[in-house]
């Protein structure tokens, strides 16, 4: 029977199934961080249990760490407590920790691929909703709750219902100034934040085959904002080249054997999907969010919708509530809206490729006098590579702040926050009410668009800086 990529990986990991019961999956990789792990470790201690496979667990510090310094004392009291607790727990249970000062420390969904801990065909979980990021490698990756974190620690297994499957085929090529971030924002805008609920998504097609691993990770990262639990892309030569030589990756002849197996991790001809979507990506323009959920997105040259554009009362109310919060109007042009802060970073767009894109626009230019711009590499490895290329100098000379690795302004859990009423051009993944600080206003966009906004001090079209 022909199978989809998702079905192949899921079925290969079922260790127990019985009628009227959820299947039990073996978990190959477990990622943990300082926020969702303390209760899980406490549960193990109370039950006097050890971890089943500490060697298959990788810990990092990312969510509430300071990005101004690698000194623990630069963190808030809450952050210090969570970080210290993780340090103690990982030492006690024998888990590898990428702690403060570690050359590989960074955002969990960036450091794992960098180290080759994320591999095609594995099951991978983390107490974080954006775990779908790792599906870019053909891994079955999804976020779990704290009680499930403890269960994986204790048993290396998890009960999991089989999801429906959705194919999203992307045809054509991007216009100049359009990126993977624009594609996923466009997709969510067209179909809503609930379209993917109950599905494992597979991105495929001409465009996907030509994307870098960084761009693929951006796509899969925001599958969760589409409503899906899982986003996947079949591994190929681009995937293998990215993995080759990394710390946890197979080496030598073993690597070649794995590559042969990984080549089988693609949907069979004739495999049935529960739903399919086909997109012509050549029509997509730079996308900007205007409201308070990731479906409230328009092209840079479009106007904010009017209430009459929606027939559903709940959608009408959602629009009015959002516009009231963000202080914008129906039928207003989004271009030209004043920006206070620019944030380039996060597990969505904090990789080297993202920083290169931003630097290309900022090179030789200055940011607007009324704008504060934070450039936050997603890992210390990204930071080092960026500095080797001189990107830090470009950012600093432009007037940006060059920070250390962490989740930073993606969420209001650390010291990098916007004040009430401040408007942020952000490369992160969520624009919820107060997401970047109480009363803050978030506009989601690509690194190129964010860099252009930093220069002009208003929401603008990045393509004018790319010769378009």
UniProtKB/Swiss-Prot annotation:
InterPro entries: 3-IsopropMal_deHydase_lsu, Acnase/IPM_dHydase_lsu_aba_1/3, Acoase/IPM_deHydtase_lsu_aba, Aconitase_4Fe-4S_BS, Aconitase_4Fe-4S_dom, IPM_dehydratase_rel_enz, IPMI_cat. [4Fe-4S] cluster binds at residues 347, 407, 410. GO terms for biological process: L-leucine biosynthetic process. Its cofactor is [4Fe-4S] cluster. Pfam families: Aconitase. Its EC number is 4.2.1.33. It is an enzyme of class 4 (lyase). The keyword Amino-acid biosynthesis applies. GO terms for molecular function: 3-isopropylmalate dehydratase activity; 4 iron, 4 sulfur cluster binding; metal ion binding. Keywords: 4Fe-4S, Amino-acid biosynthesis, Branched-chain amino acid biosynthesis, Iron, Iron-sulfur, Leucine biosynthesis, Lyase, Metal-binding. It catalyses: (2R,3S)-3-isopropylmalate = (2S)-2-isopropylmalate. Binds 1 [4Fe-4S] cluster per subunit. Pathway: Amino-acid biosynthesis; L-leucine biosynthesis; L-leucine from 3-methyl-2-oxobutanoate: step 2/4. PANTHER family: 3-ISOPROPYLMALATE DEHYDRATASE (PTHR43822:SF9), HOMOACONITASE, MITOCHONDRIAL-RELATED (PTHR43822). Catalyzes the isomerization between 2-isopropylmalate and 3-isopropylmalate, via the formation of 2-isopropylmaleate. Heterodimer of LeuC and LeuD. Belongs to the aconitase/IPM isomerase family. LeuC type 1 subfamily. This is 3-isopropylmalate dehydratase large subunit. The gene is leuC.
